[in-house]
Amino acid sequence: MNKFEINGVHHLALVCKDMERTVEFYTDVLGMRLTKGFDLEGYGQHFFFDMGNGSELGFFWFNDAPLSQPGVASAKNIVGSGSGNITSAHGSMNHLAFNVDPVKIANYREAIVKKGVQC
């Protein structure tokens, strides 16, 4: 497989230091609609804002996130699972999610693993 059929950006997830101020800025100042939000029990919170055209901007707030950390943020395992090591710092990008056909996700994962990407 050489080509991934990516149909745009689904969402971008960033890490913030203050969720209340972040929500206030994106809703009250920029006028974005808060589409969903939920608690990550014992870890923090996750919220999404509508950017239009099917794209969203997501923010994590982690209760133990460092103020800053060099490199790319990552969560080896699923956030909130109690396993893995969250290394997302305030002001970092946690992940970028693309719109892809859900039927093809397993094949795409297999293809990137074969290219040496750790998942």
PLM segments and residue spans:
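A detector for short, charged/polar N-terminal pre-domain segments
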Residues: 1-4
